Amino acid sequence: MYWQLVRILVLFDCLQKILAIEHDSICIADVDDACPEPSHTVMRLRERNDKKAHLIAKQHGLEIRGQPFLDGKSYFVTHISKQRSRRRKREIISRLQEHPDILSIEEQRPRVRRKRDFLYPDIAHELAGSSTNIRHTGLISNTEPRIDFIQHDAPVLPFPDPLYKEQWYLNNGAQGGFDMNVQAAWLLGYAGRNISVSILDDGIQRDHPDLAANYDPLASTDINGHDDDPTPQDDGDNKHGTRCAGEVASIAGNVYCGVGVAFHAKIGGVRMLDGPVSDSVEAASLSLNRHHIDIYSASWGPEDDGRTFDGPGPLAREAFYRGVKAGRGGKGSIFVWASGNGGSRQDSCSADGYTTSVYTLSVSSATIDNRSPWYLEECPSTIATTYSSANMNQPAIITVDVPHGCTRSHTGTSASAPLAAGIIALALEANPNLTWRDMQHIVLRTANPVPLLNNPGWSVNGVGRRINNKFGYGLMDAGALVKLALIWKTVPEQHICTYDYKLEKPNPRPITGNFQMNFSLEVNGCESGTPVLYLEHVQVLATFRFGKRGDLKLTLFSPRGTSSVLLPPRPQDFNSNGIHKWPFLSVQTWGEDPRGKWTLMVESVSTNRNVGGTFHDWSLLLYGTAEPAQPNDPRHSSVVPSSVSAESPFDRITQHIASQEKKKKQRDSRDWQPKKVENKKSLLVSAQPELRV
């Protein structure tokens, strides 16, 4: 009997290990870490019925802990008993999947999400021991580095708030006397009245003296704690959301801290980063009270480590879509996103599915000397830029701090997104009828490239606008934005054309070592459906595998000659799984005529001849309108431009490369002992695409 019991226990232990291995294999993704326990379970009924949902949950030892969406069909559920085994939990979930009233039930695992601020590298070790117990002397944190601020002439609007004069980004304080022209919007009478902004983060201190009068409970909730109070835990680490909120809506004239960009706006916060973050947590945050909240500001995202591809899950993607379709009474929620802080690791925001979403307005950073900070990431989905800082010797962003204080050292792209949200609030007050697409149009049209032109990487797109992979269309200009908002007409309906590239045999195509391949599509503007003649967003969905994913570079060439580096090389990305239909996004061809030849250049910077993989497919998604965005905009010709059917800019680039290779071979042939030249293999592939409208 004793040995039988021992054998049973050993068998049970082995079975548990097998189940654990199977469990880990289910969630192998883009990282090598072990699979964590599910953090949330979402149950979705076929029809809305709260009473039935609670009854089903109770019958299975579960309880309802809120809803991720406003549709009433979806519910967070948790196991009442904390002692249930993993196997028992699986049995319950499996049984519920067969329930006739349940459409789906899904266990969700936590996702890695990082706030996009940082400690200055040269002082991080000094603050490590005290960062969890920050106290304030007067208004300013005594743990912050000493910064000598440049003093400027008194601002036009003499607010008595003690740190206002030090808010250089509002007071012509950047090099050359530049700022974001916010005072011009204020002088027109706009400060964000009747606009509600919600900060999706680690919570906000709603009773802060510089926020309390503007606090909006309808734009706030605590998803981590399952209640309505977004107050963060007082552990020293959860100040990020409060700081972001202060940038938007710090009260003006109360002789405390500084002044928010939209100091009359209503400000709320969602506590969602102070705990496990799953797809459903993100969806619930992005869906909160969408008919009341105008702007959602997020300064977080996946790891900025130079080796991760990650983005919103299916529920969060659904939340984005529902937001732009139904939010703000059908005008669309406005989602503002920080572009990322992985520049020092040569990361690209193209690998971040939040900044590459069509539905987000991605914002970058510039320093007081109008340069790119060391942490800045590059990608063609960035629309515009606001100010931040780069190191401890430069002034950073002034805002409120926890507990009940102020700070001079808010930084990173975390600081840039809330400034953009505040500026957008000014424009929405000027014209509340602006749709989410209207806002993207006027932000890129009024962005000012001039302060940032001394940086490398600027080019001109096919409609004459300056573009940059670091800064988008330039520095946001609040005054210009408000003035354009006042006269802006709602843009025509957006249409989408999809072109699928049909890869000829061999399919998939082998790729090895150091190579270059060019895949071209002829686009006719969707003649068989509603045409897209004036571009907005352009997406490329690509699938490939390669021995070292970070060695690949993807560049898209438009018919008008605009080149967008969709994916630069990322030296730290050693992943060999590749990507599957990843949605790369470019906003750099905005306004162009899409008709003509589009070319996707896929190349490798690998120095290893033996590394290889396969290229499977790619699709081109064109978002835009059949008519000009505004009545007075120039119209494209009804005939495909002759420059498209003739030699395109991409053809000239290809010919130049071939010419240089030919000259190099001729030089080598004249040598007594010719050197071995390893030229890139170039394969130009053209095919008629399959068109889906």
Swiss-Prot record:
Keyword set, alphabetical order: Autocatalytic cleavage, Calcium, Cleavage on pair of basic residues, Disulfide bond, Glycoprotein, Hydrolase, Metal-binding, Protease, Secreted, Serine protease, Signal, Zymogen
Compositional bias segments (type: Basic and acidic residues): 668-681
Cofactors that this protein relies on: Ca(2+)
Name of the top EC class for this enzyme: hydrolase
Phosphoprotein as UniProt keyword: no
InterPro entries cross-referenced by the UniProt entry: Galactose-bd-like_sf, Kexin/furin, P_dom, Peptidase_S8/S53_dom, Peptidase_S8/S53_dom_sf, Peptidase_S8_Asp-AS, Peptidase_S8_His-AS, Peptidase_S8_Ser-AS
Identification of the protein by name: Endoprotease bli
Organism (species): Onchocerca volvulus
